[in-house]
Amino acid sequence: GCIKIPIRPLFLISSRKGLHRMKQSLDFPKPRLCPVTKVLYLYDIKFIYMSAKIHFRDYNPKQTVLFPQRLDKDIAGNDPVRVVDTVIDNLRLEQFHKLYKERGRSPYHPKMMLKAVIYGYMNNLYSCRKIESALKRDIHFIWLAGYERPDFNTINRFRNRVKEEINHIFTLLVIMLAEKGFITLDVEYIDCTKIESKANRYTFVWRKSTEKNRVKLMAKIKALLEQIDEAMAQENAQGDNGQNFTPSDLMAIADELNRSLREGPEPVTKEEKRHRKEKERQVKQLKEHAGKLDEYDEKLRILGDRNSYSKTDHDATFMRMKEDAMNNGQTKPGYNLQMGTENQFILDFGLFQSPGDPLTMITFFNSFAGRYHRLPDKAVADSGYGSEENYRFMEEAGIAAYVKYNWFHREQRMHYEPNPFSPQSLYYNAEGDYYVCPMGQHMERIGTARSKTENGYVTESARYKARRCEGCPLRGSCFKAKGDRIIEVNHRLDEYRRKARERLTSEEGIRHRGRRCIEPEAVFGQMKYDMAYKRFRHFGMDKVKMDFAFFAIAFNIKKMCSTMARRAINGGNCPKQNPITGIAIILYAKNQKNEGNSQNMAA
């Protein structure tokens, strides 16, 4: 007989060569393969179907052990969580103890809370609810917290409780990095970026609109008081223009009018009733104006020296962000983040409400001095900081300023040709204190122009005037104003720029200029895109500073871990100024101690 067997469930044989091999291996008679139906015919063969048995690894999630195992046995010895544990354990947190009460329920240990929050920030977990979830699910968080499980409210209260002391922890960490050779604190690369606030985008309050509406309201108040022909209204008026009225003055006038209406005789005639109703309407309108005036005064008080603020975050100022999807220059509420870095470690940071950079540099240097009781030897920044006030501060403080000015890059172009009619291109005689115009005429000094910055710094510019400019053949190219040409020159600023040009074009200056592009800019890129820190998550300047201080600590520890890992890959060959850190030695000793304890327990 003939047994009819399909190919697919038995063997995948696609050629006569495969059939021949099957015959030799199984000692089959010569089979016949139908070319049409692809069916294999075996004659006088009793075929046994054979299937391979799959063996899985043992799986028993309910398996118990005789001795409890260490939770960190599955955590690598060089894992960043161990670095966080070691760094926080070696920090002194005595200032945290005064934040807790002696009575009541025992709180969670501040070191455990600090480790959990910082490690959460290192893993892009900025929400207290996400950190709470990680403390229940992630083995790294569970080991770091020692099986403690604080809820999100407890984590949030801890962050708010230590919002003043967390800056001190950041300072201690940077000092430790300097002691271990990661940084030197001798050079600081400064730059800024705008970080959007948590406030909504369309909650703006503008100074110009507020002042304009307040002037209109004062005109309405003056017109209303002129309609009130009571003697006490004229006595309470503080000035003819009505600009000195306060909400309390208007409320006092309204109360006096109400009292006179109550104490007056009841109206009898229709005309008296109409007159009384008109007075009541005026009193009501006066109270409304008083409330509106109080609202405008409160807005101006919140504005301070700024031009805008957000209704939901009074400390946020509307600024133009780099992330402009519509490409229309739309302003959003945010903060100006100033940052100083070295070797891509954050040395110092500051949050400012002014969008401009020149006004923040001196305050930022004072913050550095307050943290480390010294100033950096060198400062590197872009042209946004190249003002006379900043140059003078750095020169008096003994800081070598590698700071660009406005047209530095334009001067460095290969085919740059200066304008022969600009004041910088004219010949200056320092002894006679005069300039020589392109036609050879002397431009004598006629006075000094003074201007004051928003910080109160006074700049002085010498004014020089030419003679007999009428009929000059170069007048059209020289200037277009009427009369003789007048120029203003800031000699002190020109001298600062000359020194900055010499530093920036030197060999060391070229090296610093090259590193500035990969120092703060790289930190901003890692912050916004690698760690997804593009927007603040709190309202108010104090909480925003607290949140970024936690982030800066987490960023520096994460950068330290990556630096240590890179050195380990390179075979431990470290530069002389960056020796093997003591943190790695501490971790190694700690791991050896833990392994010894576990071996003793097993024995």
Show where each model-derived region lies.
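Basic, short loop/linker segments at the boundary and entry of helix-turn-helix/winged-helix-like folds
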Residues: A76-I118
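Anion-binding and metal-coordination hotspots
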Residues: A52, D58, V117, N124-R137, ...
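Short, positively charged and aromatic/hydrophobic N-terminal segments
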Residues: D27, C34, Y41-Y49, Y588, ...
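Short hydrophobic targeting helices and cationic amphipathic motifs
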Residues: L12, L19-R21, F28-P29, L42, ...
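Hydrophobic alpha-helical membrane-insertion signals
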Residues: I45-R82
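Extreme N-terminal basic, low-complexity initiation segments
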Residues: C2-I7, F11
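Serine residues within intrinsically disordered or low-complexity segments
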Residues: S14-S15, S25, S598
